[in-house]
């Protein structure tokens, strides 16, 4: 294999002058599947069927905007010189941590307005959010981004990857670590773990906090392999710092809520 390898077309189809990118389609698919799972579970937990539809109508656009703002803020030198690029979200460049912040804030405000338990909503949504993240990483794959350091083709073949993944990791004459795949698989496993934990009937809020811990552990280690990380300093990756902070806060929240008796209600209640 050599420079003749052609990458997959990031554009799915054209609607007149409008190019519809696989990136957006894949993220949309992840959101729809996540919504379907959350709706099924919410009915079992005594919530109205449309609760998560109403929430998602606000949460998804706000999360995407926050994810973009987060990314642009840490790449401001580039975007200050190219302001027209700020709105070109279809090219990639959204940060999951920024989206998570937007989604949590939206969920909290929504729960207050609707007089619902924030923790109950968050617990139900946790597997859906992680599923959306797992699927969404394949949008990065189509854009040939969120990859790791340079590797040999033999290394990728030893991972027994399908040929289409190996070929897509051939970028500008070099093969790269498919870190998008590592994070996607980690997230898919996390979805299974969370679905199994539903049977344990954990204290309310702990399902969501375990999701935070699970995702952050994987993100910390995988981020260290990436070459396109947002950097706080020359050697400090923002996502790794945020991941550590989230792990500490989530563990502390579980302990604090148990000690103070704030988590007496169970997931199924």
From Swiss-Prot:
Broadest EC class assigned to this enzyme: transferase
Membrane topology per record: Multi-pass membrane protein
Gene Ontology MF terms in the entry: phosphatidylglycerol-prolipoprotein diacylglyceryl transferase activity
InterPro entries membership: Lgt
GO cellular component: plasma membrane
Pathway: Protein modification; lipoprotein biosynthesis (diacylglyceryl transfer)
Transmembrane segments: 18-38, 52-72, 89-109, 116-136, 177-197, 205-225, 236-256
Chief place where the protein resides: membrane
Localization (cell): Cell membrane
Record's keyword terms, sorted: Cell membrane, Germination, Membrane, Transferase, Transmembrane, Transmembrane helix
GO biological process: lipoprotein biosynthetic process
Enzyme Commission identifier(s): 2.5.1.145
Key word Translocase present: no
Matches recorded under Pfam families: LGT
Residues the record lists as binding a 1,2-diacyl-sn-glycero-3-phospho-(1'-sn-glycerol): 137
Coiled coil: none
Described function: Catalyzes the transfer of the diacylglyceryl group from phosphatidylglycerol to the sulfhydryl group of the N-terminal cysteine of a prolipoprotein, the first step in the formation of mature lipoproteins. Required for spore germination.
PANTHER family in the cross-refs: PHOSPHATIDYLGLYCEROL--PROLIPOPROTEIN DIACYLGLYCERYL TRANSFERASE (PTHR30589:SF0), PROLIPOPROTEIN DIACYLGLYCERYL TRANSFERASE (PTHR30589)
Similarity remark: Belongs to the Lgt family.
Name of the featured protein: Phosphatidylglycerol--prolipoprotein diacylglyceryl transferase
Organism: Bacillus subtilis (strain 168)
